[in-house]
Amino acid sequence: MADPVLQSPKNSHFFQPLLPGFDSYLNIPVKFFSKRIQGRNEGRTVELRTDASEKTWQVKIQGRRLTVGWKEFASAHDFRVGDIIVFRHEGSLVFHVTALGPSCCEIQYVPSCNNQENISNLSMKQSIKTELESSLDEDKVNMGKFPRKKHVKKRIPEAEAKSFSSDKSCFVAHVTDSNLREDTLFLPRKFDRSDGLIKGSNKIVLMNEEARTWTLILKFRNSSRTFYMRGGWTSFSMSMGLNLEIPSRLN
């Protein structure tokens, strides 16, 4: 009987972090492409949909690259370097796209009754480059862009800022050559204190969006007074495609 944890989900996903130059094209991961798309994409286009509007975007696919139309799609949705773009396969060459900011939270867009009408009138050759805080004149030129919601942060005293954390149920893991080589990841002290971890040798389970799990050993190092997990961190990182340069959030 097949392991249910390893079975393909009903709607498969892939994600890509945006690096400098991302607006030229976007690469589909090799494994996803060979399993889901290869052989059905020659001379065709993919359909991209988002929750920002009801518009369906037509983007040309050349090999593993999303090319003609990608720049307009990315610009209209105000994608930026450091964002993580999640593609949910809806069947055939149709994808639902969700954008996450550098904090791994879903990007929210300012609702507008005029957005749908404006975006439908965009030429595929238009490039929209203004920010949410652009001037009125620039806004007239760039009608059709979905502006991000502007988050206002409260000022807090410097002493409080050092210990401030908006969400103690998660932490940002920095993937490095050394922790991959040693198959070990140390947990931040703020996280292990808030989560009530028990000293000793325990097990910790990591789960991805597709419900696949990895069981690692959780230990406490007395010399540094920190928890760490090992015995599967490297395997988890490789399977998830975690990047050495992009911080990854663990909940």
Curated annotation (Swiss-Prot):
GO molecular function: DNA binding
Gene3D superfamilies the UniProt entry points to: DNA-binding pseudobarrel domain (2.40.330.10)
First-listed, main subcellular location of the protein, grouped into a coarse class: nucleus
Highest taxon above the source species: Eukaryota
The entry's DNA-binding region: 11-103, 170-251
Stored Pfam families: B3 (PF02362)
Protein name listed in UniProt: B3 domain-containing protein REM7
Annotated source species: Arabidopsis thaliana (Mouse-ear cress)
Lineage, uppermost ranks: Eukaryota, Viridiplantae, Streptophyta, Embryophyta, Tracheophyta
